[in-house]
Amino acid sequence: MTSNPIPYTPVRFEYPFPKIRAQGTLAAIGSCFAQDIAETLLDSGMRGMVNPNGILYNPYSINDALQRLECGYTEGDFFEFNGAWHSWRHHGSFSAPDPATGAEAANESAKRFRRTLKKADFFLMTVSTATVYLHLPERKVVANCHKVPGNEFETTMLSYDTCRAAIRNACEIVRAYNPDCPIILTVSPVRHNPGDLTANALSKARLRAAASEACGKVPNCAYFPAFEILNDELRDYRFYADDMLHPSEQARKIILERFLESCFIPRAMADYQAAELRRRQSKHIPIVKPEA
């Protein structure tokens, strides 16, 4: 297991439910951090799906995506800009040459995620920011700006009450699809307001408090402290990538391995380590064995 190389005070966490089985089915939604964790688990032999609308950062858009799983999308949900058709509710990976193609891809993704959610062994949701972009002509919060000129948007921060309601409602939607599925909430450790760290702190505080309340209100719901591990346990710029915003590869491994160790049976860690060994060998990365 990857360990912190410097002295530290550990963030304590005990998963309050039965450990999740290896080779199970996951459903995940949220930021690039959720995407990274889920893809690593899928590469380790788990089944499942992450982000039916592509990467989403704020709880309002995450809740909206889950609400739309049943009713789906139409060509009217797409708009044309710069020669492509985009959806305000989707990541740019869903942009298409025409609205029919975009709507078809969005609906197929929603259908696949519904199927996955109904049989998932656990659900992971990662919120990253309470800061959102409001599209002024339509007065709506957007999940992605799609490089539309900035003068069409207003930046605002969701209130605590809005964050709380969105996260709790998202959990209730998951519970309706799969009543026994454990829900694991996390706050992404990625700095989402790089130009204003005080705004980033306020944003993360609202998300953290809202996640805590959801865990107290929604059955079978727990919080995994990814944010705290990076900011309070590792708490050093050596654990950030070159952009000083995202966790470094070492930090991601530390957080992921803590997640596996805390929430899963031991075989899940063994599967991950075997997959990581294969990955390093395929890229000809030297294998460094720990000293005895």
PLM regions: where:
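Extracellular glycan-modifying ectodomains
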Residues: 1-292
